[in-house]
């Protein structure tokens, strides 16, 4: 069974967010998602300064099995990207909730966070797959 940290919020499309001290949110894909995809070989990230919209694709994760769109769980401006993934995309596999994060977003509408799933709700999504 996948690890689903309770302090994070989740999108049904298998992204997670974590609130940071500056009010921004770090975004990544869940352990469940990386298990489905398999070994990462390339990650295409948005650019710093890009505006992302909740539910729209904004990044791509390519694995030995498939290329998968990554969707923005919330809307806002991208303020940082995980440049370490350019050389080490396998960080997504080894540390999905830590060093394998994708980007950080300053939210334009924080109420979107409330629409995301808690750990229990995300587990229910996985169970239905």
UniProtKB/Swiss-Prot annotation:
InterPro entries: 2-oxoA_DH_lipoyl-BS, Biotin_lipoyl, GCV_H, GCV_H/Fam206, GCV_H_sub, Single_hybrid_motif. GO terms for cellular component: cytosol; glycine cleavage complex. Its cofactor is (R)-lipoate. Residues 24-106 form the Lipoyl-binding domain. The keyword Transport does not apply. Keywords: Lipoyl. Binds 1 lipoyl cofactor covalently. One of its GO terms (biological process) is glycine decarboxylation via glycine cleavage system. The modification N6-lipoyllysine is found at residue 65. Coiled coil: none annotated. The glycine cleavage system is composed of four proteins: P, T, L and H. Belongs to the GcvH family. The glycine cleavage system catalyzes the degradation of glycine. The H protein shuttles the methylamine group of glycine from the P protein to the T protein. This is Glycine cleavage system H protein. It comes from Shewanella sp. (strain MR-7).
């Amino acid at each position: 069974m996948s690890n689903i940290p309770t302090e994070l919020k989740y999108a049904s499309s298998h992204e997670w967010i974590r609130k940071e001290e500056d009010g921004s949110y770090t975004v990544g894909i869940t352990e469940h998602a990386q298990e489905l995809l398999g070994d990462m070989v390339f990650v295409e990230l948005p650019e710093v300064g890009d505006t992302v919209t909740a539910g729209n694709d904004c990044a791509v994760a390519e694995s030995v099995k498939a290329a998968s769109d990554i969707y923005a769980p919330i809307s806002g401006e991208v303020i940082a990207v995980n440049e370490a993934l350019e050389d080490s995309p396998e960080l997504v596999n080894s540390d999905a909730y830590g060093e394998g994060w994708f980007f950080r977003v300053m939210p334009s509408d924080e109420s979107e966070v409330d629409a995301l799933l808690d750990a229990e709700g995300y587990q229910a999504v996985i169970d239905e797959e």
